[in-house]
Amino acid sequence: YLGKPFSGEFKMSEAELNIALDWVQSNFTFLDTSDTTIKSVLDRAAISIMRTGARIVQIDPYNFLTTAEDGVEGVLQINKLLVGLKQFSEQHDCAVILCAHPTKMYRSPDGSTPSPSGYDVSGSSAFFNIADAGLTVDREENGRSKITCWKSRFPWIGSVGSCVLEFNPLTGGFS
């Protein structure tokens, strides 16, 4: 937030910390983890949207959601979940960001590790096919982070491409 280190001589002051915490409090709503069913999470997100005018709902991580239904296969559950999130986004005029971690990526014969995409999450191509946009944050071996947009359904959302950012462990920021 301030670009200052978390420790050492030039860390933020107590007054700056309080300003930062006030900013977080006024710009974010955190839901408790008492009920992690998708219905409960979306019901509470809808209330937050109505109360605060929020335009972004972020669910992190995906595998924390409980969606189990008797007699419904895993891939069908994933499809139903993603379609439900998309419908919620349209009904409430907000962006829904679902943070999902891919399966382990194995090295290619040339020694490189491919960057994951929506096809590499939870054994379902639905993460690629249903999403309007898809991003991967991939830590490279040189300590840099590669941000790849592997899908952008609409041109006003953005375009497919990538950039490399350097992480600053002192401030927790990227440049």
Feature locations, PLM:
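Cytosolic-facing regulatory segments adjacent to core modules
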Residues: Y1-G53, T67, S162-C163
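P-loop/Walker A phosphate-binding loop and immediately adjacent motor/lid segment at beta-alpha junctions
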Residues: N142-S175
